[in-house]
């Protein structure tokens, strides 16, 4: 079994889905069975699959990859239901409720010009609610409709909001029924014992600069561990030689409030940059741009990789070369892409569909 891990190196939106899809494509072309594991965050991903954008399935779905939600992934049942996704789910995944979404958005609005940078998906509110056992809701509870309804009523008492408008119980129960009938709630290693997967792709959300341990940027962080922390023990049971893919654009972006390394204007990079997924929105505002501090980038990659006990292969992936004439836009000006000593291989991408080796 081969294990590959795709990690964003910056503030997210680096091209993790593109990288994951290419790994799946190459595996599928060799006839391998593939499982992609989402191991942090929630349905914040924006994967283009066919002519649509999906938040709940792997980018490698088009290449036959199954999708699994790790126990540290926070599931939004409503999104799963609306997108009619078919996935495997760890029984201990925490769940996002409609009231979590509204709570997150209400609090973020109230912050005015001191926003934390929420995506408005309800992740932080769900994580905070889960700290209280009586209000925590886990994926395996979706399989018992009666107990689920009673738990929802109890959570209603925790949130002083109108039940019918905010909690949307009917839709949530429909989502639970959909998941019970169309998805499978199963522990990770139980799934592996029943399926002969040859390639496991762990795909992270967000980027290392948003990791909850990066206290220099608090509170403008995601409430999850972005790098290897959540999955290192699982990986060590599977292999001693995982392939790690740390992804970055040839410049840096940030969508949302908070400090940013070497921020600059889009025009300083390329005024013609078009980002179809990261459009201006109420919660994150306009996409922001910056230059790469290579020393900082390489340091955080090596720090994350050192968490793994074994001999991982560290690879770099640089995307969006088409906007920077094949160069890195760094704090020291434009630079050629050169493989650093700690790195095994460097991959590049100049379009939306393919990643190439150099």
Role assignments for model-derived ranges:
Residues 1-358:
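Non-transmembrane, aqueous-exposed alpha-helical and coiled segments at domain scale
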């Amino acid at each position: 079994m081969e294990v590959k891990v795709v990690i964003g190196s910056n503030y997210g939106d680096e091209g993790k889905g593109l990288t994951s899809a290419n790994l799946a494509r190459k595996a599928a072309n060799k006839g391998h069975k593939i499982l992609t594991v989402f191991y942090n965050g929630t349905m914040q991903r924006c994967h283009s699959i066919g002519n649509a954008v999906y938040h709940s399935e792997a980018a490698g779905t088009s290449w036959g990859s199954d999708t699994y939600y790790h126990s540290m992934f926070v599931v939004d049942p409503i999104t799963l239901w609306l997108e009619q996704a078919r996935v495997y789910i760890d029984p201990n995944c925490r769940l996002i409720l409609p009231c979590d979404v509204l709570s997150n958005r209400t609090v973020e609005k109230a912050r005015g010009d001191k926003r934390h940078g929420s995506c408005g998906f309800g992740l932080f509110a769900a994580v905070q609610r889960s700290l209280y056992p009586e209000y925590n809701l886990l994926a395996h509870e979706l399989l018992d409709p009666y107990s689920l309804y009673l738990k929802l009523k109890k959570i209603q008492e925790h949130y002083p909001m109108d039940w019918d408008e905010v909690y949307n119980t009917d839709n949530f129960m429909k989502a639970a029924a959909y998941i019970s009938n169309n998805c499978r709630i199963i522990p990770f290693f139980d799934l592996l014992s029943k399926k002969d997967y040859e390639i496991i792709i762990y795909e992270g959300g967000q980027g290392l600069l948003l990791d909850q341990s990066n206290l220099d940027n608090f509170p403008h962080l995601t409430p999850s561990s972005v790098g290897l922390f959540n999955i290192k023990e699982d990986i060590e049971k599977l292999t001693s030689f995982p392939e790690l893919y740390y992804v970055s654009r040839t410049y840096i972006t940030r969508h949302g409030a908070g400090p940013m390394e070497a921020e600059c204007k889009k025009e300083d990079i390329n005024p013609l940059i078009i980002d179809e997924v990261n459009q201006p929105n109420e919660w994150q505002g306009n996409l922001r741009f910056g230059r790469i501090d290579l020393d900082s980038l390489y340091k955080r990659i090596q720090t994350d990789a050192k968490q793994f006990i074994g001999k991982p292969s560290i690879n770099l992936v640089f995307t969006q070369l088409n906007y920077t004439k094949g160069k890195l836009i760094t704090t020291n000006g434009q630079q050629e892409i050169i493989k650093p000593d700690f790195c095994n291989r460097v991959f590049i991408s100049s379009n939306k569909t393919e990643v190439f080796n150099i």
